[in-house]
Amino acid sequence: MLLQAQRLEQQGKLPEAERLYQQAIQLAGSSPLAAEAQLRLAALYMRKMERYDDALKIYEQLIKQYRTGEIAAEATLRMGELYERQMQKTADQKERNALEQKALEAYRRLENDFRDTAVAKGEGKQRLEALLRRIDERNRNHPAYLFWDVLVALTGRQPWLSYWVAIVLFTLIVLALLTPLRVAWFRSFREMKKLEPEVRRLRERYKGQELNEKIMELYKQHKVNPAAGCLPMLIQMPILIYVFYAIRLYEYQFSKGFFLWINPSLAERFPGIVGANLGQHDLPLLVLYAISLYITQRLTPVSDPAQAEQMKMMSLFMTVFMLYMMYLWRFPSAFVLYWFVSNILMTAQQLRYMKVEPEPAAPLATTTNPPEPAPAAASSNPGKNHHTRKPRRKR
């Protein structure tokens, strides 16, 4: 029946071929023959009938049903091909970019989750390489791409040296740009730290709204803005997002670079754990990043001692969350290396600033009461009666 459907497809009788494929799927039940018929039907929808949504549903169903093995790998590969075909059919640049990213994700998933299949080693690898080259060609004139290229060229484009050194240099440059913001944050923290003893005294004397008013009065007296420490952190976010974008622009070139254990030799011995290059995911580097993140979070100073335990739990939560998300999304090791180096440098910077002990602040100025009268001076001879006798009146 499949051969007959193929002949009808070659003759251009697409509706008849579609019906035969559907009949073959029903007759085959849950056997591998049904999966083959589904793949052929989805290919018919995608390549000749342009029914992309119908084809996508079949591919998603096959991936969910088979999970691993050649059938799921084939469905993943064809899903990437489908997105590329859709990309060629649209003129909207925003939509093209979104479809291109979906195709890249499908090929990346094929490379990571189905690396031992013939599909991943053959056509999947070729399609991923071709797509990355096209993206790289398009990005070559972007300022961030050119900047990366200059950093790599400084050390001669050596695979074992140039690319990770470029990441370290890039991290130093970004940290230098962020240093004024971080210094402002530490200054704000120091001012808050100086006021801690006085804030504790206010907490002992006042409650509720009156306490808040007294604390704000104290901050105003010492010209401290409690929200000033948050502003530098908020300003950093757009910069960090751009850093991620800049690394993604140069992702294809990073696949030519290695770092210590991240190389093809060890990747073959430990597949799925060690990355073959800086463009691939690497688990040991991700674990090192998570450890550095936890240490950085724990060393972040807290102005209020009552928040110390809460900060400890938040540090642990953030570490586990970031570890899970970066593992799930299979971030390229070039990006993880940037974060790892950045955490080390920021931790060193924090330790340097934390060595300086803040001086205690002056107490809150209050209205002074008039001094109480001094007690009467005691007699110099405590053994005698303090009350003097009146002299007797003469009669």
Where would I find each of the regions flagged by the language model?
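Helix-loop-helix
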Residues: 10, 47-48, 57, 61-65, ...
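Structural signature of tandem alpha-helical TPR/SEL1-like repeats
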Residues: 13-19, 36, 50-57, 92-94, ...
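Alpha-helical segment of the N-proximal tetratricopeptide repeat
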Residues: 1-23, 27-28, 43-48
